[in-house]
Amino acid sequence: MMVAWWSLFLYGLQVAAPALAATPADWRSQSIYFLLTDRFARTDGSTTATCNTADQKYCGGTWQGIIDKLDYIQGMGFTAIWITPVTAQLPQTTAYGDAYHGYWQQDIYSLNENYGTADDLKALSSALHERGMYLMVDVVANHMGYDGAGSSVDYSVFKPFSSQDYFHPFCFIQNYEDQTQVEDCWLGDNTVSLPDLDTTKDVVKNEWYDWVGSLVSNYSIDGLRIDTVKHVQKDFWPGYNKAAGVYCIGEVLDGDPAYTCPYQNVMDGVLNYPIYYPLLNAFKSTSGSMDDLYNMINTVKSDCPDSTLLGTFVENHDNPRFASYTNDIALAKNVAAFIILNDGIPIIYAGQEQHYAGGNDPANREATWLSGYPTDSELYKLIASANAIRNYAISKDTGFVTYKNWPIYKDDTTIAMRKGTDGSQIVTILSNKGASGDSYTLSLSGAGYTAGQQLTEVIGCTTVTVGSDGNVPVPMAGGLPRVLYPTEKLAGSKICSSS
């Protein structure tokens, strides 16, 4: 039986993973598969169970379901998963549906029974650790959730924050340019209000610090994704991050690096929204701007405290899926390659590998099981190949993850970048010409390879030879990404070989 080279390589690399740890330095080398627990996999293994995103109801995904599909995730080369919040939610079916997503919590000391039991969550953690993989859990410290108007909240339903004293006075955010409003007023609306905890109060602060340390300890969690970070005052976060004792990455939903990057001074990392917007715009059409992406790579690298601890993505449950803008598979391949080979920690959202095309919430929260989990889809294989070369480069080059990605070339339709220590660098060439793009040879300078050196293009498994002038003649066709690595360094890796 022929087995894909990336499958052989990834299996060998991950089974041999070292003992687990959960420091920021350890997370630099991870690659994250993000999933909504309710929408990824069911305990019964069904691939036909109905899940109409417009209904906004629980669809039946569970922690046990995730355990049963870890081969599917690990087969793409992911070393970690990020799951949505685990706390008990408001029980009602609101006018906006159920709290299937996990962001409308009411009891932080109980688990969401729709996903399973405490033993199930512990089993998920153990199953990941047995594979050398990490568990990241989503947490919310900013707010609770209530089925009703902000002016008529019954605070007694919240545990342990069971009185109005724990919360900011009711007011909805009207002006997002006013940081005081952003922090002190409420998200939500009068259909589902999100009572905003007053995290300046020691009693609230200490409760959260105790809780997060216990959560991490009880379920052997390796990292946290923190929701709505910009809605809590900055001085709350260092103590929270310290109490967690693991890598924390925060959601600061703002594309301005001058606003977003400073949050990395109060927690380990943030989601890279500054890159998200120019990345999306560069590849969502064949007329996108490479200039803006090129410039933002350099801005984030220079202005953020540590770009190697940011989370790179183009899809999540809050933003429309990439394929909702274009169904061009070549463009989707380029954007996925960027995510995995840029600085920081790659994050791929469940369903992205199957070219899901849901638009705004709730359409972008499709059930992964309805795809049937095929492992031969074009994006599944592309993601596996890109993760494989990244994982391999990390295993061979101790400086790879801290080397700052360097854009070395751009034109109207192309961007090229290099990452890694001299002699072991990966050079990635991305195009937004799309699947109908012409065939041509790009003469690439600045790659840092030596004249006459043989390179392997690890997506298509072809080779090129560096010219006598040091330029690399890169064959481009069909708008596809090219990822180069020194051929001699691949010896024994199984990359670009079959058995």
Swiss-Prot record:
UniProt biotechnology annotation: Used in the brewing industry to increase the fermentability of beer worts (including those made from unmalted cereals), in the starch industry to make high maltose and high DE syrups (starch saccharification), in the alcohol industry to reduce fermentation time, in the cereal food industry for flour supplementation and improvement of chilled and frozen dough, and in the forestry industry for low-temperature modification of starch. Sold under the name Fungamyl by Novozymes.
Gene Ontology CC terms: cell septum; cell wall-bounded periplasmic space; extracellular region; fungal-type cell wall; hyphal septin band; spitzenkorper
Cofactor note (record): Binds 2 calcium ions per subunit. Calcium is inhibitory at high concentrations.
Signal sequence bounds: 1-21
Residues the UniProt record annotates as site (Transition state stabilizer): D318
EC number: 3.2.1.1
SUPFAM superfamilies per UniProt: (Trans)glycosidases, Glycosyl hydrolase domain
Annotated binding of Ca(2+) 2, by residue: D227, E251
Glycosylation sites: N218
InterPro entries referenced in this protein's UniProt entry, alphabetically: A-amylase-like, A_amylase_C_dom, Alpha_amylase, Glyco_hydro_13_cat_dom, Glyco_hydro_b, Glycoside_hydrolase_SF
Catalytic activity: Endohydrolysis of (1->4)-alpha-D-glucosidic linkages in polysaccharides containing three or more (1->4)-alpha-linked D-glucose units
Cofactor(s) needed: Ca(2+)
Active-site residues, Swiss-Prot/TrEMBL: D227, E251
Molecular function terms, GO-annotated: alpha-amylase activity; calcium ion binding
Residues that, per the record, bind Ca(2+) 1: N142, E183, D196, H231
BP term (GO), one: carbohydrate catabolic process
UniProt keyword Glycosyltransferase present: no
Record localization: Secreted
Family that this chain belongs to: Belongs to the glycosyl hydrolase 13 family.
Description of how the protein assembles with itself and partners: Monomer.
Protein name: Alpha-amylase A type-1/2
